[in-house]
Amino acid sequence: MTAKFTDYIVKDIGLAEFGRKEISLAETEMPGLMATREEYGPKQPLKGAKIAGSLHMTIQTAVLIETLVALGAEVRWVSCNIYSTQDHAAAAIAAAGIPVFAVKGETLKDYWDYTAKLFDWSDGGTPNMILDDGGDATMFVHQGLRAENGDTMFLDQHNSEEEEIFFALIKRILKEKPKGYFATLAKNIKGVSEETTTGVHRLYDMEKAGKLLFPAINVNDSVTKSKFDNLYGCRESLVDGIRRGTDVMLSGKVAMVAGFGDVGKGSAASLRQAGCRVMVSEVDPICALQAAMEGYQVVTMEDAAPIADIFVTATGNKDIITIEHMRAMKDRAIVCNIGHFDNEIQVATLKNMKWDNIKPQVDEITFPDGKRMILLSEGRLVNLGNAMGHPSFVMSASFTNQTLAQIELFQNQGKYEKKVYVLPKSLDEKVARLHLAKIGVKLTELRKDQADYIGVKVEGPFKADHYRY
C-alpha cells in the first residue's frame, strides 16, 4: 500500500477538485506552455532537475509547475507573497503529489518557514535549480551562506519586521542544521531564473559586487515578459483588484499612478480605460515625457495627495507614499500598490492608528483627526491580494520564458559564469510565435530578397538585440 502523500501545507486539500477544473480552463488559455510540453516532453530535458520554486501560487502557476514536471523535473513550491496564493490552486498541486507550502494570508513567519522548506527535500537532498519571483529564495541562500561564513553582524541590524523574521530564521537554521548547510546548497544549485523587475535588480547588484553564487537568467527582460505581462497584465488586473476590494465606481474618479515603467504604463491605462482621470509621477525624464505624450498629467505626489481619489504605486522603490502624503489625502482615499514589495507605501507608520478590517485584504485606517483611508492588501500586490492576478494568456508568455530558461541553465551546466544573462532573441520570438494562433494572428512572411535587403534571415530574428520595441 502506497503511503499517503503529506509533504504539503495548504489551506484546504478539499479545494483540489475546484482547482483542477480551473487549471483545465487555464490550460486552454496558455498555448505557449502546452506547446512546450508537446515539443519537449518526449526529450525530458529537465530529468534530474530539482527545482525550488518561489512564485505566486496561482492557477496559472499550477500550469507552469505541471509543465516543469512533464519535462522531467522534481519540484517544491512556495508563494512569493503572503496574499497571492489561490488556495484551490495550491490544493490541486498538493493533490497531484507535488510538495507545495502556500496559504493565502499566511503570516510572515510562515512565509519564511515555508521558504526554508523549499530547500529540504524529502530524500534528504537539496534542489539544484531555483525558479524565483522577487529573489527571496535566491536571497535565502546568499544571506544564509554569508552568515555561515562568519559575517553575522547584519542578522542583528534589521530594518523591517520581515527582515527581523528572516534573520531570526537564518540564526535558527545555523543552530539546527549541520555545519556547511548553506555552502552545500550554494554548491548544488546550478542556476536561477528570475521572474520580476525587483528580483532582477537584486541579481545585478550581487553580480556587480562579485557575490552572485550561481548563474542567473533574467526572464523579466525578455520582451515577451516585460512588454506583455508587466504592461498588458497590469492593464487588466489592476482595476479588477480595486473593484473587488472596494466596489467603487471608477469612472470619473481622479487616480494617481506613481511610476511610468512597464507596470506603471499598464496601470495608468487600466485606470484610464475604466474612466478615471489619471495623473502620473516620475523621476525619469524620459518616462515623464512618455506619460505626458500619452495625455497623462505628470505631477508630484505632493501635488496629487489632496486631489486624487485612488493612489497606486508602481515604482519598485521605497517610501513613495509617506505618512505626510496620507495625512493630506481626502477622506476614504483608496491606496494600493502593484510593485513587488510592500515598502512603496509607509504602512509601518500606520500601525498605531485605528484599523478596521472590512473584509480580507481591505482595511480602513482612521487617523487621529478622524480622516479615514482605505488600504488594499496592506500595501502588497493589489492585483493578487484583492483579485486573481494577471489573465492566463499573458502569463503563458512569461512562464514559457521561465521554462525555457530552466532548460537552458540545466542542460548547459558549466557554460554560464556566475553572471546574469537574458534569453536570446530567437527564443523571445519563438515564445511570441507560440501565442499567435490562439488569438487569430496571421504573420506576413518575408521573401528571401526582402530579408537580404534588411539583413535578417527569413525565419528571424527580425530585430537587433538593442531594439527596444
UniProtKB/Swiss-Prot annotation:
Source organism superkingdom: Bacteria
GO MF, any single term: adenosylhomocysteinase activity
Localization annotation: Cytoplasm
Pfam families (alphabetical): AdoHcyase, AdoHcyase_NAD
Co-factor note (free text): Binds 1 NAD(+) per subunit.
Any one GO BP annotation for this protein: S-adenosylmethionine cycle
Keyword Manganese attached: no
Residue positions binding NAD(+): 196-198, 230, 259-264, 282, 317, 338-340, 383
Keywords: Cytoplasm, Hydrolase, NAD, One-carbon metabolism
Coiled coil ranges: none
Residue sites binding substrate per the record: T58, D133, E195, K225, D229
Entry GO CC: cytosol
EC number: 3.13.2.1
Pathway: Amino-acid biosynthesis; L-homocysteine biosynthesis; L-homocysteine from S-adenosyl-L-homocysteine: step 1/1
Cofactor: NAD(+)
Reactions that this protein is recorded to catalyse: S-adenosyl-L-homocysteine + H2O = L-homocysteine + adenosine
Family label: Belongs to the adenosylhomocysteinase family.
Xref: NCBIfam families: ahcY, PRK05476.2-3
Function of the molecule: May play a key role in the regulation of the intracellular concentration of adenosylhomocysteine.
UniProt-listed HAMAP family: AdoHcyase (MF_00563)
Protein name: Adenosylhomocysteinase
Organism whose genome encodes this protein: Rhodopseudomonas palustris (strain TIE-1)
